[in-house]
């Protein structure tokens, strides 16, 4: 809607490409994305910058490293090369035009903790109660999440488009925190838990126990997401540097405990073995 998602041309003008990348550099790593051809109202930040440079470049440049691998084949590239590019893609699927914003967002590198929220849940205003006061550009962010075209899209500046992108990610995260407390949301997170998508406990005596994402606060921008081990009942930082930047409010403080109450058979026995400190083979006395 506000940015084109999908195809780009991959031409070898290295100098121009570098100039565009430099122009698109921003301090926030998770507030923008490249979307294609669903007839969205505004032009991407990359396209705007390319037009300013002139007619030398007609290609849109992806300005986030985790998203650059989703480029589709150039008309002049061989079939073998295009197959290689598709294998390296961060986002599955061969047709970017058919990818919804929600699917695109959940398949980004670092967003493995997120499940896809049903459109019906998002379209129910009751489920979004109170979020409009927390998220700037709320209506436009909601339209972006639902892939709804905006008649006012062309009125926004490049900076405003980026703010809407950031607002959409924040809004989806807050909706996600509510959705995973529903029966459908818990079931979706159960599949991820069984696939170890949330990682394993780094504690040696937990023997690779699967973990669950948890926030230390339900308020956005308070802390980043952590992983909770149901065996030692402690929290740890995610191993991935990408996941370590996700807001903990997008999962909340309730989820892992409600999850284990719902699926009680998955709750492991509490860890009883602890590390023993020794010096020359003798246990240290604990005062």
Swiss-Prot record:
UniProt biased composition (Acidic residues): 78-97
- The UniProt regions of compositional bias labelled Basic and acidic residues, in chain numbering, are 13-25
Record's PROSITE patterns?
A: CK2_BETA
Q: Which cysteines are joined by disulfide bonds?
A: none
Q: Where is the composition biased (Low complexity)?
A: 41-50
Does the record bear Zinc in its keywords? Answer: no
Regarding how it is modified after translation, the entry says:
Phosphorylated by alpha subunit.
SMART domains the record matches: CK_II_beta (SM01085)
| Gene3D superfamilies recorded | 2.20.25.20, protein kinase ck2 holoenzyme, chain C, domain 1
A single GO cellular-component term on record: protein kinase CK2 complex
Cell compartments where the protein resides? Cytoplasm, Cytosol; Nucleus
- Report the GO molecular function annotations: protein kinase regulator activity
The annotated region (Disordered) lies at 1-97
The primary location reported for this protein is cytoplasm
Gene Ontology biological process: protein phosphorylation; regulation of protein serine/threonine kinase activity
List the keywords (alphabetical): Cytoplasm, Nucleus, Phosphoprotein
Sorted alphabetically, which PANTHER family does this protein's record hold? Answer: CASEIN KINASE II SUBUNIT BETA
**What role is this protein assigned?**
Plays a complex role in regulating the basal catalytic activity of the alpha subunit. The tetrameric holoenzyme CK2, composed of two alpha and two beta subunits, phosphorylates the transcription factor GBFl, resulting in stimulation of its DNA binding activity. CK2 phosphorylates the transcription factor PIF1 after an exposure to light, resulting in a proteasome-dependent degradation of PIF1 and promotion of photomorphogenesis. CK2 phosphorylates translation initiation factors. May participate in the regulation of the initiation of translation. Stimulates the binding of CCA1 to promoters.
- What is said about its interaction partners and assembly? Heterotetramer of two catalytic alpha subunits and two regulatory beta subunits. Interacts with CCA1. Interacts with LHY.
Family per record: Belongs to the casein kinase 2 subunit beta family.
Full protein name = Casein kinase II subunit beta-1
**What is the source species?**
Arabidopsis thaliana
């Amino acid at each position: 809607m506000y940015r084109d998602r999908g195809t780009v041309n991959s031409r070898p003008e290295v100098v121009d490409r570098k100039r565009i990348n430099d122009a698109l550099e921003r301090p926030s790593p998770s507030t923008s994305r490249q979307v294609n051809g669903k007839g969205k109202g505004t032009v991407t930040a990359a396209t705007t910058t390319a037009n300013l440079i002139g007619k030398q470049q007609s290609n849109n440049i992806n300005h986030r490293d985790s998203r650059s691998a989703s480029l589709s084949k150039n008309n002049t590239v061989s079939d073998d090369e295009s197959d290689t590019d598709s294998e390296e893609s961060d986002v599955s699927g061969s047709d970017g035009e058919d990818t919804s914003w929600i699917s695109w967002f959940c398949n980004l590198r670092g967003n493995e903790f997120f499940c896809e929220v049903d459109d019906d849940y998002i379209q129910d205003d009751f489920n979004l109660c109170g979020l409009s006061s927390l998220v700037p550009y709320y209506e436009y962010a909601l339209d972006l999440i639902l892939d709804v075209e905006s008649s006012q899209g062309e009125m926004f500046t490049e900076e405003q488009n980026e703010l809407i992108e950031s607002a959409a990610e924040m809004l989806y995260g807050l909706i996600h925190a509510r959705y995973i407390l529903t029966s459908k949301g818990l079931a979706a997170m159960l599949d991820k838990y069984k696939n170890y998508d949330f990682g394993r406990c780094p504690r040696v005596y937990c023997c690779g126990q699967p973990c669950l994402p948890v926030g230390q606060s339900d308020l956005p921008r308070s802390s980043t997401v952590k992983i909770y081990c149901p065996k030692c009942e402690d929290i740890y930082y995610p191993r991935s540097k990408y996941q370590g930047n996700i807001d903990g409010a997008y999962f909340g403080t309730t989820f892992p405990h409600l999850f284990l109450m719902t699926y009680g058979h998955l709750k492991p026995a509490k860890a009883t073995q602890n590390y023993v400190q020794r010096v020359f083979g003798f246990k240290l006395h604990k005062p």
